[in-house]
Structures are given as structure tokens and as C-alpha cells.
């Protein structure tokens, strides 16, 4: 921002730091009140609602910058074929395994390639290691319960909504199969999955109460020293590849500010080149750009990072809905229904797909 002001005399940029928990609501409420900020860092899940209500501008991402993104990144900010934000922070997921617990259970600490292999490894731990469960399962009323489920759905060739046509595509054999499997995992998971969200699973992993769980690249820094941990790709479902959920936060440019041109220029600078590279490396995030193209290899050339990078091509975006909170509620009640065994997976999926029509 300082360099931009230097290069553009007469332009003053005032940055305001707002806690992440309240930032989105604040900028949305200011836009509704007719007093929008010039641009803001938001969860990409909010872009569709902001776009549909005319609060943000379509982003003119230069073609050279578009070509730099990892595959699938732009799908996280795309609605009806248009991009509505500059992707700025990105995460993928992988499976963390406690080799000590797996070996105690008589299982080799090798990454499971399929869901069947994952289940049998988790079952071996649950049966053979006192006080430990095979896998951590998120089921709490929390966004990351839906996110955990989507890691499995994208690993089984499924989809929730088509970002190009806006058609709800949830009701498929891929989703039904995924939901059945997620519910089945409750048999080899920690007790009462509905009480747990992902960050709490990290604590269970550190306490050696679960042998495996899915987390982002920051997981490595949160695990206690002395654990023998292996990080591998999420296993593939019967109809898919080893996928992952692709989540981004992005910079959105608001309309009706009188400084749209300048805001668009500055947003583009902040989210590209060295500025973007330093954010990714400082925050320990999956690289959003193909950095080797600009001569930046490290730290993303080590085996650990390859687990998070290699999955990108088989990943799918966090689905965009106008009312993303309602979307999350519908998905979570479907997932919780499966964990609790409340009804047939096919019925739960059909019901959720029908409800989602209202929020797209």
C-alpha cells in the first residue's frame, strides 16, 4: 500500500485491521448501509451473495496472473463464469497418521490408497489399541464439519453445485456413497463425533487418542514433539481420485465507492508476485501460485508439501451459495443424520439437495 501511494500521488490508502471473526459481517453490513469499504479480505464463500446483491465488482484478473494460479483455484471465486475476488489465501488437506499407534495395532504405517484400506486400518487401531480410536471425525455444528465431508466427496468424484451453470448436483451416487462411508467411519472414530470440530481433533491426535485425521498444512506445527507422524494423500473413494477440498479467502473490490479503479489495481498488486509469495510462506499455506514459474521453489519442494500440492488437480472448490450459512446448516444436518444413523443416506442426500435449491 505504501509503494502504491508513492507511485500514485494524491491517492491515500487507509488500512484497517479487523478481527477475522467479525471482518466479513462488518464489510457486508457497511455495503448494505451504502457506505462500502474500497476492498476487503473475505472468505471466498461470501462472494456469490455479495455479487448477487451488486455489492462487489467482477475482478479483472490479468491473463498472465490467471495462468499463474494452481489448477482449480479460480473455481473458488467463480460464479456463472465470472470471477468475483482475487484469491489470496489457500489451503488443501492431507491425512496425518500416528505411526506408533498404527504399528501397535499391527498395521504398516503406509498411506491408505482407498477408503476400504483406510477403514480397515482405523478398525485395527480401534480393536487392538486400548483407549485409542482409528480416526478423528468432525460432526459438530461448525463449518469444518462440512469441509471434512467435502474432502471425502471430492475424493469420490462428487460435487455440490456446478459453478458455471449454478445447478445443484449434490444428489448423485457419489454423494450417497460418501455419506454412507462418513457415517460408517463413526464406528472407528472417537466417541460422540457430534461434539468435535477439526481443531479439537488435533488435540486428540496429540493425546494419542486417534491414529489418523485430516488437516491442513499448518497441522505439522501443531503436533507435539516426539510423535512419529506421517503425512499422506486423502484416500480415493470407489468413484474418484485422491482429492481434497480447495478453500480460498480472497480480496473483493466493492462497488459504489468512487475509487473502484484504484482499489482494483491495488488488490491485484497485493495478491500477486512477491507480495503473495511472502504471505503464503509466512502463514504456512498451500501455495496459491505455481511459484517455480517465477523462480521461487522453496519451501514447496519438500515431500511434506507435495502431499498438499499434488492433490490440487483432483480437488474441488468450496461451493458458493448466496446464503452460505444456510448451505452449511443443510450440509451439516445431512452429515449428522448419517453419523447418528437417522435415515437412509439416499434420502438424506435427496432432502439436502432439495433444500439447497433455496439458497443457491
Predicted regions and their residues:
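Extracytoplasmic/periplasmic solute-binding protein
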Residues: 84-88, 93, 117-167, 174, ...
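Glycine-centered hinge/linker elements that transmit conformational signals in sensory
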Residues: 121-124, 164-194, 225
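A bilobed periplasmic-binding-protein/Venus flytrap-type ligand-binding module shared by bacterial periplasmic
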Residues: 96-99, 246-259
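Conserved C-terminal helix/tail region of periplasmic/extracytoplasmic solute-binding proteins
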Residues: 12, 103, 187, 310-360
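Hinge/lid segment of periplasmic solute-binding proteins
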Residues: 43-94, 99, 116-119, 145-148, ...
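Long, aromatic- and glycine/proline-rich binding clefts that accommodate carbohydrate-like moieties
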Residues: 232, 281-333, 337
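Extracytoplasmic "Venus flytrap"/periplasmic binding protein-like
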Residues: 3-72, 76-78, 104-106, 204, ...
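Short, solvent-exposed loop/beta-turn-alpha elements that line the ligand-binding surface or hinge
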Residues: 57-71, 75, 111, 134-142, ...
Amino acid at each position: 500500500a505504501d509503494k502504491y501511494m508513492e507511485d500514485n500521488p494524491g491517492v491515500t490508502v487507509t488500512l484497517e485491521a479487523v478481527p477475522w471473526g467479525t471482518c466479513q459481517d462488518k464489510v457486508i453490513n457497511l455495503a448494505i448501509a451504502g457506505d462500502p469499504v474500497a476492498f476487503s479480505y473475505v472468505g471466498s464463500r461470501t462472494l456469490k451473495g455479495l455479487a448477487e446483491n451488486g455489492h462487489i465488482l467482477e475482478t479483472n484478473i490479468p491473463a498472465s496472473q490467471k495462468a499463474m494460479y494452481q489448477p482449480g483455484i479460480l473455481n473458488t471465486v467463480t460464479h456463472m463464469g465470472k470471477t468475483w475476488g482475487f484469491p489470496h489465501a489457500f489451503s488443501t488437506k492431507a491425512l496425518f497418521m500416528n505411526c506408533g499407534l498404527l504399528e501397535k495395532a499391527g498395521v504398516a504405517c503406509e498411506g491408505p490408497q482407498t477408503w476400504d484400506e483406510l477403514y480397515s486400518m482405523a478398525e485395527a487401531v480401534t480393536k487392538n489399541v486400548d483407549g485409542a480410536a482409528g480416526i478423528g471425525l468432525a460432526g459438530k455444528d461448525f463449518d469444518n464439519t462440512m469441509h471434512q465431508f467435502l474432502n471425502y466427496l471430492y475424493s469420490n468424484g462428487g460435487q455440490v453445485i456446478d459453478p458455471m451453470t449454478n445447478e445443484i448436483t449434490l444428489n448423485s451416487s457419489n454423494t450417497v456413497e460418501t455419506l454412507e462411508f462418513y457415517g460408517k467411519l463413526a464406528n472407528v472414530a472417537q466417541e460422540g463425533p457430534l461434539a468435535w470440530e477439526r481443531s479439537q481433533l488435533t488435540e486428540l491426535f496429540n493425546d494419542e487418542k486417534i491414529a489418523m485425521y485430516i488437516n491442513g498444512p499448518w497441522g505439522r506445527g501443531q503436533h507435539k514433539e516426539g510423535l512419529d507422524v506421517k503425512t499422506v494423500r486423502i484416500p480415493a473413494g470407489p468413484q474418484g481420485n485422491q482429492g481434497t477440498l480447495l478453500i480460498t479467502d480472497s480480496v473483493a473490490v466493492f462497488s459504489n465507492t468512487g475509487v473502484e479503479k484504484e482499489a482494483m489495481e491495488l488488490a491485484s498488486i497485493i495478491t500477486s508476485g512477491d507480495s503473495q509469495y511472502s504471505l503464503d510462506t509466512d502463514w504456512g499455506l498451500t501455495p496459491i501460485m505455481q511459484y517455480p514459474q517465477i523462480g521461487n521453489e522453496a519451501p514447496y519442494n519438500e515431500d511434506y508439501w507435495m502431499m498438499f500440492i499434488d492433490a490440487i488437480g483432483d480437488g474441488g472448490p468450496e461451493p458458493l451459495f448466496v446464503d452460505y450459512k444456510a448451505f452449511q446448516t443443510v450440509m451439516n444436518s445431512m452429515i449428522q443424520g448419517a453419523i447418528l444413523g437417522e435415515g437412509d443416506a439416499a434420502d438424506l442426500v435427496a432432502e439436502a439437495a432439495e433444500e439447497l435449491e433455496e439458497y443457491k
